[in-house]
Amino acid sequence: MAEASFYIGVIGNVISVLVFLSPVETFWKIVKRRSTEEYKSLPYICTLLGSSLWTYYGIVTPGEYLVSTVNGFGALVETIYVSLFLFYAPRHLKLKTVDVDAMLNVFFPIAAIVATRSAFEDEKMRSQSIGFISAGLNIIMYGSPLSAMKTVVTTKSVKYMPFWLSFFLFLNGAIWAVYALLQHDVFLLVPNGVGFVFGTMQLILYGIYRNAKPVGLSNGLSEIAQDEEEGLTSRVEPLLS
């Protein structure tokens, strides 16, 4: 069983790495144009937070080194993304991004780690507390896929929900959910089970609306849809994250 979970975890690592790298095209555009334009930094800041907490969880939880390796990679990549955003963002946005990043990726992780280590002497309880926090954050971050699905139903168009991103959300959730079952890890199982369900729902919606006649978009809805298109790569980041 341990050997099976190892191979499943390796597959999960490969898929998660591909998902972490999926925003490269977006940031290549930012670098090329030397402007962040209308792109948002929050998805990458939140993904960095999730990756950092899961890295710590993998380090302090026996047998979960595959979780720490992929999320350590993810934290590094997301740090690069956020740094590029800060470099090319206008001054007013830079200051706002620094404030949010410091709050979520400096103060919050430190507070979470210090609080769990102060509250519990048992290492198992400490790791479980971090796992609970990480799983909760992942589930909250799934609000973005829900927004993408709402846009598809409203517009009857899958333009803003690319097939491959939905497919990898489905596949990533499935692989890590299986890994969690083999490892008997409920903190990995719950968020990745949710990711699998949302990925399945998105693939079903894609099948229903891929040939449907799109409905005209209002300006407000167009902006929402555009945001989804620009931020879709990070909407899957609750990946196991």
Swiss-Prot record:
Main location as per UniProt: membrane
Cellular component GO terms held in the UniProt record: membrane; plant-type vacuole membrane
Effect of disrupting the coding gene: High fructose levels in leaves, especially in vacuoles, due to impaired vacuolar fructose export. Increased root sensitivity to high levels of fructose.
Keywords: Membrane, Repeat, Sugar transport, Transmembrane, Transmembrane helix, Transport, Vacuole
Intervals, Vacuolar compartment: 1-3, 63-69, 116-128, 183-185
Domain MtN3/slv: 6-92, 129-212
GO molecular function: fructose transmembrane transporter activity; sugar transmembrane transporter activity
Record Gene3D superfamilies: 1.20.1280.290
Cellular localization per UniProt: Vacuole membrane
Induction: Slightly induced by the fungal pathogen B.cinerea. Accumulates in response to nitrogen deficiency and cold stress. Expression follows a diurnal rhythm with a peak in the middle of the day. Induced in roots by fructose (Fru) and darkness, thus triggering accumulation and release of vacuolar Fru, respectively.
Mode of membrane association: Multi-pass membrane protein
Record note on quaternary structure: Forms homooligomers and heterooligomers with SWEET1, SWEET2, SWEET3, SWEET4, SWEET6, SWEET7, SWEET8, SWEET9, SWEET11, SWEET12, SWEET13, SWEET15 and SWEET16.
Family: Belongs to the SWEET sugar transporter family.
UniProt name for this protein: Bidirectional sugar transporter SWEET17
This protein's encoding gene: SWEET17
